[in-house]
Amino acid sequence: IFPIDLRKKIIQLATNLMSSSDKLTKLNHLIQGQYNGAHVYFLFRSLFCEQELGSLFSDPLLLKNEISKNLQRTQELIDSQSQLSTVDTISYLEMSHYMNTTLLRDTDTMSMAHGLEVRVPLLDHKLIELMFSIPSNMKIKKGSPKPLLTNSLTNKLPKFIVQRKKMGFTLPFEHWMRGKMRSEIETVLLSPSDKLSNFISQDGVQKMWSNFLDKRCSWSRPWSLYVLKKWADKNL
């Protein structure tokens, strides 16, 4: 896709900036032609690149089989929606994956933990069907990633709210993992797990923790390994 000289320059730039960005790690992975998935969406929504999984799995054959099954599943999904535009394909994948397995699950878990009933009116099937019928070029506008939603609220909310930049919401996991929780997480991650020894490489886990401490990867990667090991110790 890219001329070799341009590819090298982009890779070098990404490498120089990569120390604290998983997104750039994935970009580097993509540019080097190491991603063979059904759609680039799955690369940027995944926690680990295939190369990283190779260092975490203790059984290369098992990893190969799992990657193959996942590729078949995702390719069938992409093929079933081949009539969609690029924008609508991303919307569909977000709705059927990240929103479904992460956002809605987290919303339900956290709201129920505090006795709250949460509703999601923007997921009404009639509204979703309407949105998929609208041409893609109307859904993206320079300087306004969600122009239809923004315009629909122009006369209902103060201007400073409608025009303000997107505000993310991220819990301070990194701060916790480098502070009060470090001892607990380090104990779990650096202790071999008999229940996972046939699947997970302890050396790979330790390297991932070291990368986090050196700010070469985000908190979400070692955190996911910590949760996996805690779950295995409790349930297997």
Language-model regions: role of each:
Residues 21-236:
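Adenosyl-5′-phosphate
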Residues 1-12:
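A mobile, often basic/glycine-rich helix-loop segment
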